[in-house]
Each structure stands twice: as structure tokens, then as C-alpha cells.
Regions:
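Catalytic-site neighborhood detector that most strongly recognizes the C-terminal catalytic loop/helix
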Residues: 174-178, 257, 261-282
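C-terminal catalytic core of tyrosine-transesterase DNA break-rejoin enzymes
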Residues: 141, 145, 151-152, 236-260, ...
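Basic/aromatic-enriched alpha-helical hairpins
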Residues: 1-68
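Conserved tyrosine-mediated DNA breakage-rejoining catalytic core shared by Y-recombinases
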Residues: 104-107, 116, 120, 155-193
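Short basic/aromatic active-site micro-motif
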Residues: 38, 79, 210, 227-247
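Basic, Lys/Arg- and aromatic-enriched nucleic-acid-binding interface segment
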Residues: 56-61, 69-74, 78-82, 93-97, ...
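DNA/chromatin major-groove-contacting recognition/catalytic segments
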Residues: 125, 181-187, 191, 195-196, ...
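C-terminal catalytic core of Y-nucleophile DNA break-rejoin enzymes
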Residues: 175-219
Length: 288
């Protein structure tokens, strides 16, 4: 059933999670395991396995190579356990099993992850600093100004770019969620699009993101005097925090980011809580 989910995942971005979950299940149990074998004890065993599992489930031990054990992150455990839960729930709903062994079993609790982002001044520094790969600079700054994910930037075509008077709008389907989005962008962001070509042409032709571009992003940031551990996705976080910091209301920011739930956007409001920042300065000086 997990393999079936891999063929038709609910989102393209979720495929990797299903694939990783399947690999860990293959390590935990043998091919002869059936639904009849899965009970509360088996599920608890899988939880215990995830607590001790290595990040790379396919890693082979080579006596000539020294390995450093890297366990699963808390949120990876949450994701993989929930994948198993989804499979068992589906099996129960489709009457493949008479009882759902997952009922009443508590999963892992998600861990809140700090979001790295750039301040407006840092974005200005990045913009003013040369980058060895102009396409990387253009796409990263475009993401800082629009909040678009790199996966959507990679596939963006000119047919998705529309002009409405003075405004530029991107009409596209999110790769991660499949949701239809209507994103108005600023003139400043539109300037990074370049010269319009055929509708089927990619806007940022030649842009792909991998290990070398990740390294180059860090080099570019260091050249700008920024030592934060940047990834391309930090640009999306940067957009969200900048919008809230500049006074945009959270509902509008949520729509611009294409979030399905407002609670997802509220994480950024928590990062930038000016009320708390002001409150801590209310205490008078305690120095004589």
C-alpha cells in the first residue's frame, strides 16, 4: 500500500517522504509481513525502530570507511509514522482489515524548527554582491520578493506570467500542493523575469538547484558578509517575515504564500513578534 502511494502521492513534494518511509519499513520488517502481522506491538516496535534508526536506511556498512551515525530528526519520525498511520487507516476504510491496530496509539510529537531568514538589510547586501552564477542570484532574489518555492520557480513558464495593466500576475499550480494560485508580484520582482519569450519557454531557463548551487549560495552569502546557514528555501521565509515586518496583514501574507491553513503563516508571526520585543523593554533600569 505504501508502494501504491508512491505511484500517486497527494503532492509531488510528498513523494520523497513516502519513498523514505518505505525504505525504513523494508529495514524494519521482512517481505513476508502481512496486515495480519500488524498489531499494537508491531506498531510500537516500528516506533522504537524510528527512535534508533539511521537517517539513510540504505546505508551499507563498509569496514574500510568510518561512518558517523546520524539519526532521524524528530519531524522525520513524525512524517514516517504518519505515513504508516495513513496506510492502515486506508486499509481499514477499504475493509482490507477488520480492525485498525493504529487506533489509540499515540504518534510522535512534532518539533518546532527555527526558520532561517534574511533581514531587509541583508537582502540588500545580497543584491549588491556579485554572484558567480547570475541565474542563481536572479532566482534567489526573485524568491525573496515573491515567496515562490524553488520547485515552482524551476518550472515557471512564460505562459503563467500575465499582465493586468501595470500589475504582473503569476497564475500557476503549486508543485507541492497542486493548488491553483494567483500571485501578484511587484515591479521590482518582475524586473528579474527578463525578456518575455514563448509561452512554453521556462522563465528561468537553465536554473536547477543541487549540491553545487547550494554551495554557491553559501559562497555568495559569505561574500556579502552573511554567515547564516542559507538554503534556497530561506528566501521564502525571508519574504514572509519581510511582509509581516513591513505591515502586511497576516491573511494577505497567507494568501501570497499559498498556505492552506492560517496556522502555517502564524509561525512567521511568532518569529517576528514585535509586541514581545517591546514588552521586554518595559522594565525600568535596575542599576543604581
Amino acid at each position: 500500500m505504501c508502494e501504491d502511494r508512491l505511484k500517486t502521492p497527494d503532492s509531488n513534494g510528498n513523494w520523497g517522504n513516502w519513498h523514505s518511509c518505505l525504505k525504513h519499513l523494508e529495514v524494519y520488517c521482512d517481505e513476508a509481513t502481512t496486515f495480519d502481522d500488524i498489531d499494537a506491538e508491531w506498531i510500537q516496535g516500528f516506533k522504537d525502530y524510528l527512535n534508533t534508526a539511521e537517517k539513510d536506511a540504505q546505508k551499507k556498512t563498509d569496514p574500510k570507511v568510518s561512518y558517523v551515525f546520524v539519526g532521524l530528526s524528530q519531524n522525520s519520525k513524525v512524517s514516517y509514522f504518519n505515513k504508516l498511520r495513513a496506510c492502515l487507516n486506508q486499509a481499514f476504510e477499504e475493509h482490507i482489515i477488520d480492525k485498525n491496530p493504529m487506533r489509540g496509539i499515540e504518534g510522535f510529537k512534532a518539533e518546532e524548527v527555527a526558520r532561517e531568514y534574511l533581514t531587509l538589510e541583508e537582502v540588500k547586501k545580497m543584491a549588491a554582491t556579485p554572484c558567480n552564477y547570475p541565474i542563481l542570484k536572479a532566482t534567489f532574489l526573485f524568491s525573496c520578493l515573491t515567496g515562490l518555492r524553488k520547485s515552482d520557480i524551476e518550472k515557471l513558464t512564460w505562459g503563467e506570467i500575465q499582465k493586468f495593466g501595470k500589475f504582473t500576475r503569476i497564475v500557476f499550480k503549486q508543485k507541492k500542493t497542486g493548488g491553483q494560485e494567483y500571485l501578484d508580484i511587484s515591479d521590482q520582482a518582475a524586473a528579474y523575469l527578463g525578456t518575455r519569450r514563448n509561452d512554453v519557454d521556462r522563465v528561468f531557463e537553465g536554473f536547477t538547484y543541487g549540491a553545487w548551487t547550494s554551495l554557491e549560495l553559501k559562497r555568495w552569502a559569505l561574500a556579502a558578509g552573511i554567515t547564516k546557514n542559507l538554503t534556497f528555501h530561506c528566501a521564502r521565509h525571508t519574504f514572509a517575515v519581510m511582509m509581516l515586518d513591513l505591515g502586511a496583514d497576516i491573511y494577505t501574507v497567507s494568501k501570497l504564500l499559498g498556505h492552506r491553513e492560517l496556522s502555517t503563516t502564524q509561525i512567521y508571526a511568532k518569529v517576528l513578534d514585535k509586541n514581545k520585543q517591546a514588552a521586554v523593554n518595559l522594565i525600568p533600569s535596575i542599576s543604581e
